[in-house]
């Protein structure tokens, strides 16, 4: 069974046993969280699509790690004007282990 969940403004297709990296969630490492924003549920040819959410469906996950992605370098330049601007950004993430898909 798989589910399409929404967290951090993004959508992820998940199944039990998978590991995913999502936008940072305020939770401790080892803590179990419940995601109730399930947009769709499916198993084989059977698919249940929510309007916008599937009622009673939840996904439970365990927090494996809190971390930061690799640095993204931003470089702006105006030719012939001696203008250069450098900037870097590292986005925070939470790594989750999907325990169960219920619904």
Curated annotation (Swiss-Prot):
Record has ATP-binding as a keyword: no
GO BP term, example: translation
Assigned GO CC terms: cytoplasm; ribonucleoprotein complex; ribosome
Keywords, sorted A to Z: Ribonucleoprotein, Ribosomal protein, RNA-binding, rRNA-binding
One Pfam family matching this protein: Ribosomal_L21p
InterPro entries xref list: bL21-like, bL21-like_sf, Ribosomal_bL21, Ribosomal_bL21_CS
Record has Ribonucleoprotein as a keyword: yes
Record-level Gene Ontology MF annotations: rRNA binding; structural constituent of ribosome
Subunit structure: Part of the 50S ribosomal subunit. Contacts protein L20.
Family: Belongs to the bacterial ribosomal protein bL21 family.
Function recorded in the entry: This protein binds to 23S rRNA in the presence of protein L20.
Name of this chain's protein: Large ribosomal subunit protein bL21
Species annotation: Leptothrix cholodnii (strain ATCC 51168 / LMG 8142 / SP-6)
